[in-house]
């Protein structure tokens, strides 16, 4: 999941973790 708003298990949203 890149540049998405999916939430990883027990993690913060990818949008915040990995901003494209």
Curated annotation (Swiss-Prot):
Coiled coil: none annotated. Residues 1-20 are annotated as: Disordered. GO terms for molecular function: serine-type peptidase activity. Transmembrane segments: none annotated. Its EC number is 3.4.21.32. It catalyses: Hydrolysis of proteins, with broad specificity for peptide bonds. Native collagen is cleaved about 75% of the length of the molecule from the N-terminus. Low activity on small molecule substrates of both trypsin and chymotrypsin. The keyword Hydrolase applies. GO terms for biological process: collagen catabolic process; proteolysis. Residues 1-20 form the Peptidase S1 domain. Keywords: Collagen degradation, Hydrolase, Protease, Serine protease. This enzyme is a serine protease capable of degrading the native triple helix of collagen. Belongs to the peptidase S1 family. This is Collagenolytic protease 36 kDa B.
